[in-house]
């Protein structure tokens, strides 16, 4: 599928034409109560969201959560059954993709194998009838922007996966769209290439100031690249927020467990500042929001389960190391703390200092401010 989609009026005005602007105080993109069904399956369930001009937003969630369906609805590729989409003050809800203002990059690159890199980048401009000289100039400028000036005469098969994705990105930008849509563009690449390219995409987005939406199931990718993350589950939005907010202050149990690693235990509020988990009493600032005796899920990040080296306030638990996974810069410990299964993450330096190995005892401390609580059905 062609990755250079945009309004014909912009093409006729020239590739450098300014995108339409929304009124002051209005969001650049407003998604209003979108619902999309495939037969009896509801892929999007009354979804609403606003995105500001120049933002980099990631749609994050597991397979089947609706993130790609939402992206495709914004593009007009899978139109919604209900709801509206307003872009730059214009209702695009019923417009075909060719009349919407966006460029899109797919996971599969979608490059034409029989065309050179230069021709691939300029394809959308040629199809809109722009002069050949203007097309080549624009295509070469974009190849320079993505660092591929010396690859213009090559064919896609002669490029690496990372280079092909850069070509697809350049082609998506050729029409100077107001919105860039990225549908899991890095998932087919090797790990090191993926990390490098996501940094390049973020730097390019900042340089151009283009409003960007990227779909991903990779939590680390979303945390590292997004201005805001939209966490989705079962066709609904669970939480919208900055990476730090979503990671440190998840609003639901699903977000807590999906974004990053999490220890999740069943407990009961024991008072204004503590929860009872098994035989342990764990100090928790969040307990003040619940009545005594309330069943809760008790959540603690592995990096917040720290060795007791003195001076750190919190609950101290005597534990035994049951397993150790060395991951280079960090080590992941599986602990048994008086019958409670806990995962802790330590820096390589801390691991070497403590000289830990399976079977050895370790006292850990959990700061009360780092304990998250979520309501729990008593039988759960």
Model-found features: residue ranges?
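Conserved coupling/switch loops of ABC nucleotide-binding domains, chiefly the family-specific signature
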Residues: 81-84, 134, 234, 266
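ABC ATPase nucleotide-binding domains
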Residues: 56, 95-254
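Conserved ABC transporter NBD signature motif
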Residues: 83-91
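The feature captures the beta-strand-to-loop junction immediately N-terminal to the Walker
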Residues: 60-62
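Glycine/charge-rich catalytic "coupling/switch" loops of P-loop NTPases
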Residues: 2-13, 278-325, 349-380
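Helix-to-loop junction immediately C-terminal to a conserved catalytic motif
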Residues: 75
